[in-house]
Structure formats: structure tokens, C-alpha cells
């Protein structure tokens, strides 16, 4: 069987720099570059009263999103890419370097399974 895309879900706990719009935006840009995806649009928004940040990159190949809860030290990340030339797992070292989590959980889902 073949899949149309791969979806990597990353749970980050005990993070640093997740209350900064600039840090989240830079992490998204670097993660997109690492996956070899094509950035089409990027939006980053602050959330009050906890200084959380949400950012989403629209990719030619799908999307990458980050949502943060600084009061909990937690960030939720989705990296969904389609196409043989992309590697969503390549975002993981970027996230680790940028946010320095104490704990990280990674789940992978194959999307759009096609029977050959």
C-alpha cells in the first residue's frame, strides 16, 4: 500500500522560548526548510492572557502548525506533508534545538492509504 502523505504529531513538554512570536516563527521557517517543503504562507498569532502562540505554515505539500501553552511549558506540533521529496520527520531536530523540551513524544500517521 502507498500513502498520499505523512503526518508527524509532536508533543513537547518543558519547553523554552514558546512565548515568543519571533522564536515560534523562526522555528516554523527552519522546520519547513528542513522538511524540504515549499512555504506558501505563514501566520503567527499571540494568545492572551497566557502569552501562548499559534503559528501555521501553509505549504505546497500541506501544512505545519505549532500551538503553545507557556504556562504549562507545552507545545503541540503537526507536520503533514505529501510527496516523495518531503521528509516531515526532519522537522523534529529543529524543534528540539529551538524549544529544548525536557520530554518529547512523536507519533506518525500515514494519510490517504491507497491499495496498489
Swiss-Prot record:
PANTHER family: S-ADENOSYLMETHIONINE DECARBOXYLASE PROENZYME. It comes from Thermomicrobium roseum (strain ATCC 27502 / DSM 5159 / P-2). Keywords: Autocatalytic cleavage, Decarboxylase, Lyase, Polyamine biosynthesis, Pyruvate, S-adenosyl-L-methionine, Schiff base, Spermidine biosynthesis, Zymogen. The active site is at residues 62, 67, 82. InterPro entries: AdoMetDC_C, AdoMetDC_fam_prok, AdoMetDC_N, S-AdoMet_deCO2ase_core, S-AdoMet_deCOase_pro-enz. GO terms for molecular function: adenosylmethionine decarboxylase activity. Pathway: Amine and polyamine biosynthesis; S-adenosylmethioninamine biosynthesis; S-adenosylmethioninamine from S-adenosyl-L-methionine: step 1/1. It catalyses: S-adenosyl-L-methionine + H(+) = S-adenosyl 3-(methylsulfanyl)propylamine + CO2. The keyword Cell membrane does not apply. Belongs to the prokaryotic AdoMetDC family. Type 1 subfamily. The lineage of its organism: Bacteria, Pseudomonadati, Thermomicrobiota, Thermomicrobia, Thermomicrobiales. The record marks 61-62 as: Cleavage (non-hydrolytic). This is S-adenosylmethionine decarboxylase proenzyme. One of its GO terms (cellular component) is cytosol. It comes from the Bacteria. Its cofactor is pyruvate. Catalyzes the decarboxylation of S-adenosylmethionine to S-adenosylmethioninamine (dcAdoMet), the propylamine donor required for the synthesis of the polyamines spermine and spermidine from the diamine putrescine.
Amino acid at each position: 500500500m502507498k500513502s498520499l502523505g505523512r503526518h508527524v504529531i509532536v508533543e513537547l513538554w518543558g519547553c523554552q522560548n514558546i512565548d515568543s512570536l519571533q522564536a515560534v516563527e523562526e522555528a516554523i521557517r527552519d522546520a519547513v526548510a528542513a522538511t524540504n517543503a515549499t512555504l506558501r504562507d505563514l501566520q503567527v498569532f499571540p494568545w492572551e492572557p497566557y502569552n501562548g502562540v499559534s503559528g501555521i505554515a501553509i505549504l505546497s505539500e500541506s501544512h505545519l502548525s505549532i500551538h503553545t501553552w507557556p504556562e504549562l511549558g507545552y507545545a503541540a506540533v503537526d507536520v503533514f506533508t505529501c510527496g516523495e521529496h518531503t521528509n516531515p520527520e526532519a522537522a523534529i531536530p529543529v524543534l528540539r534545538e529551538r524549544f529544548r523540551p525536557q520530554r518529547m513524544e512523536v507519533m506518525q500517521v500515514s494519510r490517504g492509504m491507497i491499495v496498489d
